[in-house]
From Swiss-Prot:
Component of the ribosomal small subunit (SSU) processome composed of at least 40 protein subunits and snoRNA U3. The keyword Nucleus applies. DEAD-box RNA helicase-like protein required for pre-18S rRNA processing, specifically at sites A0, A1, and A2. GO terms for molecular function: rRNA binding; U3 snoRNA binding. One of its GO terms (biological process) is maturation of SSU-rRNA from tricistronic rRNA transcript (SSU-rRNA, 5.8S rRNA, LSU-rRNA). It is found in: Nucleus, Nucleolus. It comes from Lachancea thermotolerans (strain ATCC 56472 / CBS 6340 / NRRL Y-8284) (Yeast). Residues 1-12 have a biased composition (Polar residues). Residues 21-35 have a biased composition (Basic residues). This is U3 small nucleolar RNA-associated protein 25. It comes from the Eukaryota. The gene is UTP25. PANTHER family: ORF PROTEIN-RELATED, U3 SMALL NUCLEOLAR RNA-ASSOCIATED PROTEIN 25 HOMOLOG. Residues 1-170 are annotated as: Disordered. Pfam families: Utp25_C, UTP25_NTPase-like.
Length: 747
């Protein structure tokens, strides 16, 4: 298999698919007998019968809230039987072993015990506000039967007249005609999700599970400042061949975009209105390939958010309209096989670091949607928007990250109907879920195992991680947890219509089709681990690499002359996992003796440590194995300790001050009395290198230090190439990491 072959008839044309029709008919019969479908698939039917039928459905649904345990067990067994039947009839892979609870998953998975580390990092959290947030999440996770779609039935009266995404109330014939013309364009959603043969999908899935996938890559040079790397998964037994990047037009005109979105966003003419950044990412985004994009400046966030907001809406509208069309087709011919759904309704998950970022993202989506009615918009603004600004003397990056509402605890659902956006919707009835890593962690990894729930993430087709560089300073494990829980086969049925679920959902292959978009200011090993290790999109992935010239590096922007020493320790014959141990040994054997017998200043030594585990290790060593007088300040220190230790360091009463990167990220202290700086590891953010090194300049200005004697020393290994590149420049970083010398000095 040279590659995954896309064919418009690949699925329906296979004998395996034909053989599954009898099973699908049985499932449709079972499904109809089990109760009403209450979700997107019935919206078009509900619009005509929003009176007496609603009451009848409510009467049918109500008993399910208090069904006995025996019925729940029977339901769970029936759900497992449905999955087994589908796979057996379809000739799919063996049934995936999943745990089915004897009892229905709890409807309110909230945590009564707050993680102490998380609460300490949220300095301004109020306990009553936390309780309100937990209650809101509790309500949003109530089983879908209790928060059905009664409110949808009255405002979706234009379904049949709006099958092409153009509202025809008081209709405009030209808009209708344009809507039909748009369908002549290639639909990348249809191509990506519905045109890959099941044989190829199964082969790639088996290769991933056996760890026999090989990625083949190629580079595209955009200009002298940037290049893109495209990688595609291939099977080990495929013949070696050069990989070429997918064709792209760098224009929205090449893609099928719903007509109402084109009208709302002024995209009807053929004029290209994309910015240079948007032209770089429009093709990977709209062709449903994965993307890790490192942007240059915070001002660029608006540009990529504008584009993915349009992409998200286009995906939701097209997916939803296809289901509504198929509802009508099934009414005309119930024997048709129309596979257009997942297990649950949510299709888009957006992860953001703060409420301010979430407010900006969701506001863009609302503005671009073309819908005027937004339920609970005032509540959304009240809870997510603030006009607060950080002090003007703080660095620009700090002001950008910590403006507005910096609360990092939230999960919010948004549901789209024909005329209305419903915020704070039930998660199982939402189209978009926007969350912080901490907020969704409360649901996915609840301390009470009975309250854990991840079924609402089972059918996510588009995952967006925004401002990853900021999320990395919260808790990376929370973000990793999302990737572990997404696209799993749900443990409960949730009224899924199995006769319409796509087979790659049934076969637990949704991860091969999910698109992941990651945006960050600074690429990092963690970012690479996500795109390389957690994303399995069969369509491949893109990463950009920015070339840093010396004048644009941290050294070029430092603005003062002092000794800058970069000291490398080697990892010959050692694995990546042994790097922290090698760094610590080098620190103990080389750096500590220099501190004890310093030829420069004996005090005023600031030791900057990016990783908290390294900080604890170094602190314990200095405390137990040396007689060095030192103090330490970190992100978990109380305010009294922060003030006291900084004052003693400034007065020279302690010789060394240990300072963590997370504390600097959240506070940006101006530490006084610094005469020597030691970086235990290169900072993740190059701005931090400049800010900390400039402490020496301030001491020199106050007459406390001489820049000819002061030193900035940085430990690094060849694994620190990404961080070094932004500090010294791309070419210099290559010399430092692979050159013959172990020590390099700049001045």
């Amino acid at each position: 298999m040279s590659s995954l072959k896309r064919s418009s008839s690949a699925i329906k044309g296979s004998n395996e698919y034909r053989s599954s029709k009898s099973g699908r008919k049985q499932l449709r019969t079972i499904r109809k007998a089990s109760g009403p479908r209450r979700g997107l698939a019935e919206e078009s039917a509900n619009e005509e019968n929003n009176g007496s039928e609603t009451e009848a459905e409510d009467k049918l649904a109500a008993p399910e809230l208090n069904e006995p345990a025996q019925d729940q067990r029977a339901g769970g067994e029936a759900y497992a039987a449905l999955l087994t039947l589908l796979k057996a009839e379809h000739g799919g892979p063996a049934r995936r072993k999943t745990k089915t609870d004897d009892k229905k998953t709890s409807a309110d998975p909230t945590s009564n015990v707050k993680d102490e580390e998380e609460s300490e990092s949220r300095d301004n959290e109020d306990e009553e506000e936390d309780e309100d947030e937990e209650a809101a999440i509790e309500n949003a996770l109530m089983d879908e039967h209790t928060s059905g779609d009664e409110d949808d039935e009255g405002d979706d009266g234009s379904h049949q007249d709006d099958i092409n995404g153009v509202t025809r109330e008081g209709g405009d014939a030209t808009e209708l005609a344009a809507g039909f013309e748009e369908e002549d364009k290639p639909d990348t959603l249809e191509i990506h999700f519905n045109s890959v043969s099941e044989k190829d999908t199964n082969a790639l899935d088996a290769a991933f599970k056996a760890k026999e996938v090989r990625y083949r890559s190629c580079k595209l040079h955009v200009d002298k400042n940037q290049e893109f790397i495209y990688s595609r998964p291939t099977l080990v037994n495929e013949p070696a061949s050069a990989v070429s990047a997918p064709d792209g037009s760098q224009s929205l005109n090449s893609y099928f975009i719903k007509q109402r979105l084109k009208i709302q966003n002024d995209l009807l003419d053929s004029q290209d209105k994309l910015t240079p950044l948007q032209k770089q990412i429009v093709d990977p985004m709209f062709q449903y390939q994965d993307l890790l994009y490192e942007y240059e400046d915070y001002d660029k966030e608006t540009e990529y958010r504008d584009l993915y907001a349009l992409h998200v809406l286009n995906h939701i509208y097209k997916t939803r309209d296809r289901i509504l069309k198929n509802n009508q087709r099934l009414q005309e011919n119930p024997d048709q096989e129309l596979l257009d759904q997942g297990f649950t309704r949510p299709k888009v998950l957006i992860v953001a670091p703060t409420r301010d970022a979430a407010y900006d993202i969701l506001s863009k989506i609302i503005q671009k949607s073309g819908l005027d009615q937004v339920d609970k918009k005032a509540k959304f603004k009240d809870q997510f928007f603030q006009e607060a600004l950080p002090p003007s003397y703080k660095p620009k990056s700090f002001q950008q990250l910590f403006k507005g509402n910096t609360n990092d605890f939230f999960v919010l659902g948004a549901k789209f109907t024909r005329k209305t956006i419903k915020l704070y919707s039930n998660f199982y009835q939402s189209d978009i879920i926007i969350c912080s890593p901490l907020g969704i962690q409360l649901i996915l990894e609840n301390t009470d195992k009975k309250k854990r729930q991840d079924d609402f993430l089972s059918s996510i087709e588009l995952l967006v991680v925004d401002q990853l560089h900021s999320i990395e300073f919260q808790n990376m494990l929370h973000l990793t947890s999302i990737f572990e829980h997404i696209n799993k086969i749900p443990q409960q049925q949730h009224d899924a219509d199995f006769s319409r679920i796509k087979m790659w959902y049934i076969n637990d292959q949704a991860k091969l089709f999910r698109q992941t978009l990651i945006f960050t200011k600074f690429s990092s090993p963690f970012a690479n681990s996500l795109i390389n290790g957690k994303c399995r999109n069969y369509a491949g992935r893109w990463k950009n690499h920015r070339v840093i010239f010396p004048e644009n590096s941290s050294l070029g922007q430092l603005g003062m002359r002092t000794r800058l020493i970069f000291q490398r320790f080697d990892l010959v014959g050692k694995s990546v996992s042994e790097e922290p141990d090698s760094r610590f040994k080098h620190f103990c054997s080389v750096i500590v003796p220099n501190i004890v017998k310093s030829t420069g200043y004996e005090d005023g030594i600031l030791l900057y440590i990016p990783d908290y585990t390294d900080f604890v290790r170094v602190r314990n060593y200095l405390r137990e194995k040396t007689t060095i007088l030192f103090g330490d300040i970190n992100e978990y220190s109380e305010q009294r300790q922060l003030t006291s230790n900084r004052a003693m360091f400034q007065q020279g009463r302690v010789k060394v001050l240990l300072y963590t990167e997370r504390l600097h990220h959240f506070r940006r202290y101006e530490i006084k009395g610094v005469k020597t700086v030691i970086f235990y590891k290169p900072p993740t953010n190059p701005e931090f290198f400049e800010e900390v090194a400039r402490y020496l300049g301030k001491s020199a200005f106050l007459g406390l230090a001489d820049l000819n004697i002061s030193v900035v020393r940085c430990l690094f290994s060849k694994l620190d190439g990404l961080s070094l590149e932004r500090i010294v420049g791309t070419e210099r970083a290559a010399v430092l990491t692979h050159g013959p010398n172990e020590t390099y000095e700049f001045k």
